[in-house]
Each structure stands twice: as C-alpha cells, then as structure tokens.
Curated annotation (Swiss-Prot):
The gene is rpsH. GO terms for molecular function: rRNA binding; structural constituent of ribosome. Part of the 30S ribosomal subunit. Contacts proteins S5 and S12. PROSITE patterns: RIBOSOMAL_S8. This is Small ribosomal subunit protein uS8.
Length: 132
C-alpha cells in the first residue's frame, strides 16, 4: 500500500503508540523520517531509534518512546505542512508552541531542525510538525 504522506504516517503511528502506552513503534524508513527523529531525540521527546534493513531491500525504523513516571513525554504531535497544503514560514514568523514549552520542526535549506535552532541560524523553511 502506498502512503501519500510518509511523515504524517510516522507521526500518526507515534501518536497511536503513545495513546496505547507502547514502548516501541516501527515505521518504514526514509531520510526525512530519520532527520525528524534526530531532532526529537536531541530535544528529549524519544529515547532513540534504530534502523534495520531487510533482505528484500526495505528498511524499517524502530522508535523507542519516552515516558516520565508512566506519563508520555509527547502529549501532542501534529502535522502542519501536508502534501495538499504546504506551509512555509520566514524566520520572523516561526510560531512558538505552547509558549515555548513545545517545539516546531522545520525543513530548511540548512537541514531539518527545531524552531529555536532555525531562529539562531536565521533561516526559515517548511513547517513540518509541532510537538508538545
């Protein structure tokens, strides 16, 4: 089955796994998904992830979700820019999530990064998702 929005599919899998209190969730691998997971890991929203490749050439990412005293660290994770409606922001218009308690993830010419990092590097881009 083909997926029209691979990043949205990964975020939905994470949201569903957190709702069911799962410790791990797997998703097909891609470079964009891995870069977004790098940001989530650096910001402390997931424990980590491992990428494995199968004999048929397909790769899969297994994501270890993070909990603090039984409560999921990820409370809300939403896709902003979708295949049918791309959302681009300048450095001045990067939104704050939950008054700075959450993060936005952007795809910029300098790579995939969190909102505060994009402000530091003075670069805008496509607003991929918000995490709180």
């Amino acid at each position: 089955m083909s997926v029209s929005d691979p990043l949205g599919d990964m975020l939905t899998r994470i949201r569903n796994a957190v709702g069911r209190k799962k410790t791990k969730v797997s998703t097909p691998a891609s470079k964009l998904r891995a870069r977004v997971l790098d940001v989530l890991q650096a910001e402390g929203y997931i424990r980590g992830y491992t990428q494995s490749e199968f004999e048929n050439g397909k790769a899969e990412i297994e994501i270890e979700l993070k909990y603090y005293e039984g409560v999921p660290v990820i409370r809300e994770i939403t896709r902003v820019s979708k295949p049918g409606r791309r959302v681009y922001v300048s450095v001045k218009s990067i939104p704050q999530v939950a008054n700075g308690l959450g993060i936005s993830i952007l795809s910029t010419p300098k790579g995939v990064m969190a909102d505060h990092e994009a402000r530091e590097q003075n670069v805008g881009g496509e607003l991929l998702c918000r995490i709180f």
